[in-house]
Amino acid sequence: MAITPRPPAAFDASRQSYGYPRLTVELREQHEPVGKVRVARLMREEGLRGRPPRRYRPQTTQSDHDGAIAPNRLAALPAITARDQVWQADITYLPTAAGWLYLAVVIDAFSKRVLGWAFSASLATDLVLAALEVAVQCRGGQGAPGLLLHSDRGVQYASARFRALPAAHDITPSMSRRGNCYDNARAEAFFSTLKLEHTYRRRFADHEEDRRSTFEWIEAFYNRRRRHSALGNQSPVDFENQNN
């Protein structure tokens, strides 16, 4: 079977993001007898270049407010060994020609799956509420025994309105230490991947275009197709199915 044409097709299927290690795994699952050295050579010949990850740079959150601060319960966990043990919540901004669009997500720390997301033109508490509601519905409308919801100390997560929603589903809140965003590194790493592989590769004309495109990237590609080396080169959904 000729393999020379296959790397470009597999590369395009990765949204032109895979380097040779993940592309090798992709081709092997398509029953191509290739090794990393050969795939690297074929990529050079075709002029294909993946999107290398950027070094994680934490950004602190303004936490000077009167909201309730939960203790950092995540720090006391020896390890995360199952899904629905820890969810991590965070907010980022996406640039468009019409101004900033804000994205809130809830991520399963075990599988890296984005369970919930919401978009807004403002940083109102409704944004993080909507993302958590989607995550809860993704898991059948309820939390799990002992589930932690970890976030930074942002005013949205500390508000009384937000705190009522985890409490209603028996989800225990946890918050990062002041000025220490490494506590929420999984969510920050997701945002870095999103911006590098998707957001910064095009210019969105308005909020609606960005919403549609980012939703499709998260749900159709990131959750279900994108391979993660930390997950044994599986997608988050495949990793959950294997470890359910």
Task: Label the predicted regions.
Residues 1-244:
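Charged DNA-binding/catalytic regions of mobile-element recombinases
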